[in-house]
């Protein structure tokens, strides 16, 4: 199965709000398969705005998805 990933800033660490946002973003990419979502520390993305603090932690969320094949 294909893997989808999203990288999000985590100013408060891993909390329920961030997990909910990650699930929402992953669901935009396809139907989540299974019950597992991997959470990893991520490198700072290149396209981060200048006003984002240098010490901001980013988390990468990965999940197996069934991609959407129809038109959107």
UniProtKB/Swiss-Prot annotation:
Domain of life according to the entry: Viruses
Name of the protein this chain belongs to: Gene 42 protein
């Amino acid at each position: 199965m294909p893997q989808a990933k999203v990288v999000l800033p985590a100013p408060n660490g891993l909390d329920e709000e961030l997990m909910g946002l990650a699930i929402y973003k992953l669901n935009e990419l396809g139907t989540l398969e299974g019950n597992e979502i991997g959470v990893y520390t991520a490198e700072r993305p290149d396209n981060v705005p200048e006003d984002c603090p240098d010490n901001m932690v980013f988390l990468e969320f990965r999940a197996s998805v069934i991609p959407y094949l129809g038109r959107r």
